[in-house]
């Protein structure tokens, strides 16, 4: 096969202008003989990455509300169940160990620290998958794809079923917390671990509630949002409003968002990564253009 577009370099044996200077125009055609060579260059066949095309196609249109990709499967529910069971086991060890050792304040303070740091942890993870990697990234590729879709159609998260939305985090919690449950009996450690893991496991649900209208939320959730214990819609709106610079990544309580945004912590991290590795975050370009 040859390309329809051919490179045709023109090569002349003699300089044309001196030959024709003193010759009548009517005789020029018989003397203007040029040797023309055609170079036929085979076209290089393009083999697009079919898998990439399929993945990108998913981001073209929002899925309908009854799309199976938004529904929970049995596997999703099993992972959520495993994650919740693991967190409960850690919490039980904290309570039982605290009463057995006659220490209650320390596990409670450790739990509070876990709650506060879980918000920070959710922000760091949210920032990472929003800005780096793609669908082919090991372990978190599907979450990165979902995050990109979320920035195109934020309202989709309100119709995504709980197990579908949280199973990936529940799986991670199961693998990380279960060894601690089996190996450690310290009530203070489990006070921190159980609260941190609980907040991380449910942070995507907190995120979904922050996109929902108050009229559709349970009264207790609205009360917690108004008290600042859970991320509210008013707090989270900045994350989707600033198209050139993402903000408000933390999605448990949002308590860290002002600190991180005012001090431009994530912007500093992005610059460091760019200088060191030459990788630009997606926040440096319009996310809706992807």
Please tell me what each predicted stretch does.
Residues 105-134, 199-208:
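Hydrophobic alpha-helical membrane-embedded segments
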């Amino acid at each position: 096969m040859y390309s329809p577009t051919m490179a045709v370099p023109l090569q002349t044996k003699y300089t044309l202008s001196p030959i024709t200077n003193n010759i009548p125009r009517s005789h020029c055609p018989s003397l203007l003989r040029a040797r023309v060579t055609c170079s036929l260059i085979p076209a290089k066949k393009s083999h697009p990455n079919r898998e990439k095309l399929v993945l990108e196609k998913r981001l073209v249109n929002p899925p309908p509300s009854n799309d199976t990709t938004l529904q929970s499967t049995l596997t999703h529910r099993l992972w959520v169940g495993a994650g919740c069971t693991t967190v409960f086991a850690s919490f039980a060890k904290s309570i039982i160990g605290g009463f057995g050792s006659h220490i209650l304040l320390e596990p409670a303070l450790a739990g509070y620290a876990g709650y506060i740091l879980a918000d920070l942890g959710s922000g760091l993870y949210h920032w990472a998958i929003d800005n780096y990697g793609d669908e082919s990234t090991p372990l978190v590729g599907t979450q990165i794809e979902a995050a990109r879709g979320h920035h195109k159609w934020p309202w989709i998260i309100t119709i995504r079923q709980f197990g579908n939305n949280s199973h990936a985090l529940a799986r991670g919690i199961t693998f990380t917390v279960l060894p601690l449950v089996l190996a450690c009996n310290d009530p203070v450690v489990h006070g921190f671990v159980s609260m941190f893991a609980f907040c991380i496991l449910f942070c995507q649900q907190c995120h979904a509630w922050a996109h929902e209208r108050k009229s559709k939320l349970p009264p207790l959730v609205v009360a917690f949002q108004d008290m600042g214990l859970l991320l509210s819609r008013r707090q989270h709106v900045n994350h989707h409003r600033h198209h050139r610079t993402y903000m408000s990544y933390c999605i448990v309580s949002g308590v860290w968002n002002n600190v991180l945004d005012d001090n431009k912590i994530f912007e500093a991290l992005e610059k460091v990564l760019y200088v060191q590795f030459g990788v630009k975050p997606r926040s440096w370009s319009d996310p809706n253009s992807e």
